[in-house]
């Protein structure tokens, strides 16, 4: 279905008088900018105030949202929130350099692990995602990927658990995030049973347990961070914060990350590797290329140990199904002018050619082209006066 980016664009309806306003440009806010109240969006427990949020569709059940915030000291932080609904056509895979290789089969990969022939080494997260796609029998397509555990930077060996396709490569003294045989996600302490685990990677620290922030987390050392959490409904959340790049992004403390995850609905979460290793790569809906979306502090994507791959198992056929409109689900500062763009997508979110505009208009009567968007505020409410491209929901 075609869904317009914001329900009250083009005068369809007006927002409530107390609607939160946020701007989409620029990423850096003026010192005296009027900001939304922290309690309206995730991340407020540690004094994080959102400035902008930009959500992109990735695939069925998968989104990636860029969140620009200001911390309690007034410094800017840029984070990336990935949300994965495991009830959709999507799953998660652990990966390691050399495990998935050209033309390999599950039987060959199992024999490699059982025979102790998987060598410790490092490669980029995006390279591991590409290798998954070149194996002969892997399912689906990698649509999002992120780095995982701490590792020995000399050898590439992860410090904690690593299980791929049910093959136990390594254990350790760290808690681990796992996908079970029934497809659900869990986080378990070190030493837990792994007989029902299909995929697993570790992280050195628990951040959230039983819906509460773990006591004693560091509150001062702000740097790039990465993490994974699970909500009560079973959906999975990745959250990465860029850092060491002031004034663009100072980074976050462990406590701030835990606070953000808790406010995002996570009932359990672990910390993954941060620093220059922190990587988020995604293939946005309507495109075919997996690209690094965050800003690694090294200036480029670092080689890492293991990774987590988000795999869409939906059918990518290249046939036009809908338009992927960006930006999506945003609110804008009064007076902003916002141009929308559209890409063709198939039913799985893969790239597809957009039909010619006259045909699209003929088959989609709720497609409306109007003037550039301009949002103006009066003392009582915000009014939408139109947008470049507005698409009402088509049932």
Segments (PLM) and residue ranges:
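Conserved, well-ordered active-site substructure
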Residues: 155-172, 179, 213-267, 277-322, ...
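Beta-strand-rich structural segments
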Residues: 336-350
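Zymogen propeptides
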Residues: 5-171, 186
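A short beta-strand micro-motif common to beta-rich folds, especially ectodomain repeats
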Residues: 379-395
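Active-site-adjacent helix-turn-beta-strand microarchitecture at beta-sheet edges
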Residues: 53, 146-219
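Conserved beta-alpha junction segments in alpha/beta enzyme cores
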Residues: 64, 68-72, 77-83, 202-233
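Low-complexity "stalk/linker" and mucin-like segments enriched in Ser/Thr/Pro/Ala/Gly
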Residues: 361-383
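Short, solvent-exposed loop/linker segments at the N-terminal edge
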Residues: 330-336
């Amino acid at each position: 279905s075609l869904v317009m980016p914001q329900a009250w664009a083009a005068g369809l309806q007006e927002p409530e008088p107390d609607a939160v306003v946020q701007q989409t440009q620029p990423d850096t806010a003026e010192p005296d900018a009027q900001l939304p109240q922290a309690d309206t969006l995730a991340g407020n427990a540690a004094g994080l105030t959102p400035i902008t949020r930009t959500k992109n569709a990735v695939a069925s059940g998968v989104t990636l949202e860029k969140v620009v915030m200001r911390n309690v000291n007034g410094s800017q932080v840029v984070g990336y929130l990935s949300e994965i609904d495991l009830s959709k056509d999507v799953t998660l895979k652990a990966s390691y350099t050399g495990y998935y290789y050209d033309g390999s089969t599950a039987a060959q990969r199992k024999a490699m692990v059982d025979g102790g022939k998987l060598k410790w080494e490092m490669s980029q997260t995006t390279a591991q995602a590409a290798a998954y796609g070149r194996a002969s029998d892997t399912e689906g397509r990698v649509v999002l990927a992120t780095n995982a555990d701490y590792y020995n930077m000399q050898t590439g060996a992860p410090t904690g658990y690593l299980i791929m396709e049910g093959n136990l490569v390594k254990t350790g003294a760290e808690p681990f995030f796992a996908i079970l045989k029934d497809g659900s996600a869990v986080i378990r302490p070190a030493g837990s049973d792994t007989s029902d685990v299909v995929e697993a990677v570790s992280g050195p620290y628990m951040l959230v347990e039983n819906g509460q922030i773990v006591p004693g987390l560091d509150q001062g050392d702000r740097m790039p961070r990465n993490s994974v959490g699970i909500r009560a409904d079973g959906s999975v959340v990745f959250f990465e914060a860029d850092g060491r790049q002031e004034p663009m992004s100072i980074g976050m403390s462990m406590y701030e990350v835990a606070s953000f995850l808790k406010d995002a609905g996570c009932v359990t979460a672990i910390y993954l590797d941060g620093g220059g290793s922190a990587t988020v790569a995604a293939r946005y809906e309507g495109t075919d290329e997996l690209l690094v979306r965050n800003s690694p502090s090294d200036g480029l994507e670092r080689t890492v140990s293991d990774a987590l791959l988000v795999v869409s198992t939906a059918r990518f056929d290249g046939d036009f199904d809908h338009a992927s409109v960006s930006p999506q689900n945003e609110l804008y500062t009064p007076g902003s002018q916002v141009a929308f763009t559209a890409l063709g997508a198939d039913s799985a979110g893969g790239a597809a050619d957009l039909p010619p505009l006259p045909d699209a208009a003929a088959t989609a009567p709720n497609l409306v082209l109007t003037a550039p968007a301009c949002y103006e505020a009066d003392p009582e409410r915000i009014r939408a006066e139109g947008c470049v491209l507005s698409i009402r929901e088509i049932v």
